């Protein structure tokens, strides 16, 4: 059992040592973000705090008092802040 643990650790360390990290300059990073490759982190917009406050207020949580203002702020939160 100990032999297999040692073998697993040795293989993991060997595989980690073979990974080469190359630096990416800002131009390449921008091109990757525009092309959609990889995971993009969406920017958090300035209006998110206000829109979230409007969307999560009590009148927007109640189906009877939910209005167009609630819908607009909640749609903004879903599209731009989450």
UniProtKB/Swiss-Prot annotation:
Annotated signal sequence is: 1-21
Would you tell me the Gene Ontology cellular component terms? extracellular region
Compartment(s) of residence: Secreted
What keywords tag this UniProt record? Answer: Disulfide bond, Neurotoxin, Secreted, Signal, Toxin
Cystine connections: 48-70, 55-74, 60-81
- Kindly indicate whether the keyword Secreted belongs to this entry: yes
Q: What is this protein called?
A: Turripeptide IX-04
């Amino acid at each position: 059992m100990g032999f297999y643990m040692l073998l697993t650790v040795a293989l993991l360390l060997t595989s980690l040592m073979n990974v080469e990290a190359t630096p990416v300059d800002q131009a390449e990073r921008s091109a990757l973000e525009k092309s959609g490759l990889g995971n993009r982190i969406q920017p958090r917009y300035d209006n998110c705090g206000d829109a979230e406050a409007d969307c999560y207020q009590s009148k927007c949580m109640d189906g009877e008092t939910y209005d167009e203002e609630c819908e607009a702020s909640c749609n903004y939160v879903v599209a731009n802040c989450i």
